[in-house]
Amino acid sequence: MAAGSITSLPALPEDGGGAFPPGHFKDPKRLYCKNGGFFLRIHPDGRVDGVREKSDPHVKLQLQAEERGVVSIKGVCANRYLAMKEDGRLLASKCVTEECFFFERLESNNYNTYRSRKYSSWYVALKRTGQYKLGSKTGPGQKAILFLPMSAKS
C-alpha cells in the first residue's frame, strides 16, 4: 500500500453474515466446566448435574439472551430451563421464572460465569464429582463456576 492511499473494506453481505456463519450465536452449546471436566447436563425429570461424555444428548443447551448480559439456559432434549432456587439448589424448570435468568460474563481467562440474577451473589457451579454446587457455596475465583461454551452441533 502506498503512503497516503486510502483503503476501503468490503461491504458486509446482505444477509448480515460476516466472520461467523449465519445462526452462529443461536446454535446449541455445551457448557464445559473447568472443575473436573464436566459438561452441564439438564435431565427431563428436572435434575441438573455434570457428565464427561459430550455425546450425552442432555448436555445440548440453548442459551437465549433475555436482555443485555442476561441469559436463560434451556436443555434442548429435556425442554426445561436451568433455575436456581432460594436455597441455592440447581434444578430444571418446565417454564421460565425469575430464577431462570443468569448474568453471563466473559472472564479474563476466557471462561464464562453464570451468576443468578435473582440471588445475585450465587453462581452456577459444578463440583469435581459432577454434582452441582449449592449457590451459597460459590464465589468469584472458584474453578467450579468457570464454563467454556462449546458448539453442540452434530
UniProtKB/Swiss-Prot annotation:
The modification Phosphotyrosine is found at Y81. Coiled coil: none annotated. Residues 1-20 are annotated as: Disordered. It is found in: Secreted; Nucleus. One of its GO terms (cellular component) is extracellular space. PROSITE patterns: HBGF_FGF (PS00247). Keywords: Angiogenesis, Developmental protein, Differentiation, Growth factor, Heparin-binding, Isopeptide bond, Mitogen, Nucleus, Phosphoprotein, Secreted, Ubl conjugation. There is a cross-link at K94 (Glycyl lysine isopeptide (Lys-Gly) (interchain with G-Cter in SUMO1)). GO terms for biological process: angiogenesis; angiogenesis involved in coronary vascular morphogenesis; behavioral response to ethanol; branching involved in ureteric bud morphogenesis; canonical Wnt signaling pathway; cell migration involved in sprouting angiogenesis; cell population proliferation; cellular response to mechanical stimulus. It comes from the Eukaryota. Found in all tissues examined. Residues 127-143 are annotated as: Heparin-binding. Pfam families: FGF. The record marks K127, R128, K133 as: Important for interaction with integrin. Belongs to the heparin-binding growth factors family. Acts as a ligand for FGFR1, FGFR2, FGFR3 and FGFR4. Also acts as an integrin ligand which is required for FGF2 signaling. Binds to integrin ITGAV:ITGB3. Plays an important role in the regulation of cell survival, cell division, cell differentiation and cell migration. Functions as a potent mitogen in vitro. Can induce angiogenesis. Mediates phosphorylation of ERK1/2 and thereby promotes retinal lens fiber differentiation. Monomer. Homodimer. Interacts with FGFR1, FGFR2, FGFR3 and FGFR4. Affinity between fibroblast growth factors (FGFs) and their receptors is increased by heparan sulfate glycosaminoglycans that function as coreceptors. Interacts with CSPG4, FGFBP1 and TEC. Found in a complex with FGFBP1, FGF1 and FGF2. Interacts with FGFBP3. Interacts with integrin ITGAV:ITGB3; the interaction is required for FGF2 signaling. Interacts with SNORC (via the extracellular domain). Interacts with GPC3. This is Fibroblast growth factor 2. It comes from Rattus norvegicus (Rat).
